Amino acid sequence: MNTFFQKAVPIWAKGRADEMNCELAFRAIIAGQDASLHLAASSIYRVWVNGKFVCAGPARAAHGFYRVDEIDLTPQLCAGQNTVVIEVTAFNVNSYDTLDQPGFLTAEILQNHAVTAATGDGSFGVYDLHQRIQRVQRYSFQRAFAEAYRLRACKQAFYLGSDGGAERLESETQAEKRYLRRETPMPQFEPLQVQRIVQTGSVSFDVPCDALRKDRAYTQIGPMLKGYPADTLEEHLSDEAQTFAWKPSCHAAEDTAQITLENSYATCRFPYNATGFLCMTVECAQACTVYLLFDEILTDGDVDFLRLTNCNCFKYDLDAGTHRIMTFAPYTMMYLKIAAKGACRVSEVRMLQYQHPAPEFQIRLPEQKQLREIADAAVRTYRQNALDLFMDCPSRERAGWLCDSFFTARTEHALTGQCTVEKAFLENFLLAERFAHLPDGMLPMCYPADHYDGNFIPNWAMWFVLELEEYIKRSGDCAFAERAKSRVYGLIQYFAPFENEYGLLEKLEKWVFVEWSRANDPDVVQDVNFPTNMLYARMLQIAGRLYGDSALLEKSQKLQETIRQRSFNGLFFTDNERRTAHGLENPGNITEVCQYYAFFMGTADKRIYPELWQTLVQKFGPHRAADCCPDVAPANAFIGDYLRLELLYLDGQTEKLLQDLKEYFTPMAERTGTLWEHDQPSASCCHGFASHVLYWLAKIYGTEKTQYAGA
């Protein structure tokens, strides 16, 4: 039953609800009295009042559900008539960020408890400004489309109530929607100014390139990865930008108020790696084209806009006049290269940050510069990745990954004392009636997301159960365990056919993921992977505790003993066994992370394996010598380094924990002001799980309820 809207119904332009990358504007004129806007939309929206940006959204939900935002418009209103514009882009492609669902907007404005404008009654006009270029490449494999626009200065009048050259369209009512309340807080959209210009120079266009880099999101468009095929694109953004030749002339400038460009570029630096909507004002006496290229770091002193396999290059064709540019979706960057073909003046370069509000608690840190820098970086990392659910990264994917969420959830409780985002995140897994393209019982590795290729990570589904137990302990929400019971037992039922004669999971399907290291290599994760089975035993134990199931508890205990007997070689736990004609044989693969799994999952403890424990504590970690245990492959940040630090914390080795923490994270905090996916800047440089650093610091030093000054 719809309890969120009194009159509004979902609408879209007639015949266009399934159109890919379709941007429309919905406009209403209201009086200047207190007003509240309620809306839900697919895929993403932004709201303007009298030409000024108000907010963007929505919060994401499971397939077939849509969360409703309630926005107070009163502060933006003036006396007399006011123009409210809601822009919505419907992507209609599968991704890990937004769902492949038809475009719609349901919106109504309440004033004095009465509806003064509502979609479906004619008070919201539907328009196409014909500025967004639809046929562009995907932004990444995990996200929908990159951005390219043909902006006309006259159309800015549309946001103030004039015609502006927009085409009014006939609307039609869409299928009825199921609505949910937005439980997570609205972002605050704090502006972040460019700090300085790090390089300027000239640029030549259309310079032949020997070998163009082309990502799968560009070349593999089809039923499994929806988008516009390369031969149908209006703009080939990544190809075009690879034909630019840069000639640096100046390497630094402090004045960023106005940047004059003519067939030239300027590379700007933000104070830290940030996520949000990139904004600027561009004035040009004649038509010109502006390109925005960006990344989280500089690679060999320059912006590599394809480093993360994203298309971090957007294009704006501008006519003569003044243009206010704002990206429609949020992006992540520390470095922005602005290039102009033709002449223009660029000013007011800034980002409207799209992140969780400032946390309620801060950590009572000692006066240590390194710890403060790490904590500040961790807070930024958390805020950028905990908006409406727990994301892996705010850049390439913006996806709600399991396992990552186990760690980020601890940070939320440390910083806010609540589990609001975690509940919304976990609830999405329960709301879905089924997970299309996945086998019965299996949970998606990230959600809400579309997995048309049928891929999943069996390990990550197990982490759902581990997080479920911690969520219930943190929140006291025991009813949630009952809501999740069918999911948990469905998962256990899924794994049952993979148990071999020893009770070990063997030859699991799809992406068996241990961590980003040698432990993930194909010859290590199959056929019987011991870290995976350690996790399985822990999952069974937790399910047994949650639901009072003694059979699961007994099964877990037996499995742990089997792993100890078959994996441990007298010095280390080995990673796997392979099935041969003679049965299971151990090839002797050993990884550092396997040892951490053993201790974290309860397979091992320091009482039974004291020598191994001392080796891990004293010889491994960030200070590990190059010639130390050469047969043991090193761990990476995700998740080995974090399991190591957690084990040190649980063992009460605070001094050692802080020492390792500084060695791991100081280089990250100093370089980007955020914490990374890997121990090197080879992937995402703002990864949500990395904020778990704050959990340990909060446990060690305590927290106090105050505005966090370092974010």
Predicted regions and their residues:
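Active-site core of glycosidic bond-cleaving carbohydrate-active enzymes
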Residues: 400-711
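Extracellular/oxidizing-compartment recognition motifs
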Residues: 1-395, 404, 420-423, 436-439, ...
